[in-house]
A protein has these predicted regions:
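N-terminal pre-domain/capping segments
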Residues: 1-80, 255
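Hydrophobic faces of well-ordered beta-strands that scaffold small-molecule active sites
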Residues: 3-7, 24-26, 53-57, 93-95, ...
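Active-site beta-loop-alpha junctions enriched in small/polar residues
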Residues: 6-10, 27-31, 58-60, 98-100, ...
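Acidic (Asp/Glu)-rich catalytic clusters
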Residues: 14-20, 39-54, 80-89, 118-124, ...
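Glycine/Thr-rich phosphate-binding loops of Rossmann-like dinucleotide-binding domains
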Residues: 34, 103, 137, 201, ...
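Charged helix-capping and loop-helix junction motifs
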Residues: 38-45, 75-78, 107-114, 141-146, ...
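Active-site acidic/histidine proton-transfer and metal-coordination neighborhood
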Residues: 63-160, 169
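Histidine-acidic metal/acid-base catalytic patches
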Residues: 147-164, 168-255
């Protein structure tokens, strides 16, 4: 089990050292723009890092939508992201589940997901689908939909990323999320380990620092005890607060 944080891309190694992580997650292009990542100038440095590196794909990507003007650019941006991530040996690229929109065919959304993963297979990069917090037309908010998606894509080079804030906000009890994710995939590939500023089933994606939000501490501790996988904190407050959250996780793993 490796523990780290989502940190800045430009000084990733230095920031990871500061929060005392042995893994980290970065964006390699703007999360809110349709701009493909540029080749990294620090490939050698990243390749020499002694731990897994995760890349979070831009938030704009929605490979499930029936809207061609969004789906096609999403596939291109995902593939370009995978190519650059592969260049420095990233372990996986994390992508939000997306949505089919009002009146969309969710079954078609699952098929679009399969096509998107197939398109990036030649990059060798593993895709991790992340559960999301809100939206009744979302692919990966409700557990039943996540399970149906897995039936369509589970034989490909793909895994699941469990975000604890998102499952809480999406109305999936934490222990149930862990058990059902593991039943699907045998091993959860990655946990985005975040507390929540909001109440259960709020559909609001507002992360909070560990132990300071609304998710009961015993629920968070259950995740650490039962997931046995890499942990990335995506909590607010900058590096100083993330350093505290990384330490929070380490204390509970060693006790």
């Amino acid at each position: 089990m490796n523990i780290g944080a989502h940190i800045g891309s430009a000084k990733a190694i230095e920031e990871n050292d500061y929060v005392k992580g042995n893994t980290f997650q970065i964006f390699i292009s703007s999360p809110q723009m349709w701009r493909s990542p540029k080749p990294r100038e620090d490939v050698d440095i990243l390749q020499d890092f002694n731990g897994p590196i995760y890349v979070h794909a831009p938030y704009l990507i929605n490979v499930a939508t029936p809207n061609n003007k969004v789906r096609h650019p999403s596939r291109k941006l995902l593939k370009d992201t995978c190519k650059v991530a592969a260049s420095f040996g990233a372990k996986a690229v994390i992508v939000h589940g997306g949505s089919v929109g009002e009146g969309g065919d969710i079954g078609q959304g699952y098929d679009y997901w399969r096509k998107a993963i197939q398109e990036v297979e030649n990059t060798g990069m593993r895709i991790l689908v992340e559960n999301t917090a809100g939206g009744k037309n979302s692919i990966a908010r409700e557990m039943d939909s996540i399970e149906r998606l897995w039936e369509v894509i589970g034989d490909l080079n793909v895994g699941l990323c469990l975000d604890t804030c998102h499952s809480w906000a999406g109305g999936i009890p934490t222990q149930e999320a862990v058990k059902r994710f593991k039943k699907l995939t045998k091993k959860i590939d990655l946990v985005h380990f975040n507390d929540s500023k909001d109440t259960f089933n709020s559909s609001r994606d507002r992360h909070q620092n560990l132990g300071k939000g609304n998710i009961p501490i015993e629920e968070l501790e259950y995740v650490l005890k039962n997931c046995k996988t890499d942990i990335i904190v995506e909590t607010p407050g900058g590096l100083d607060e993330q350093k505290k959250d990384v330490a929070w996780v380490k204390r509970r793993i060693t006790n």
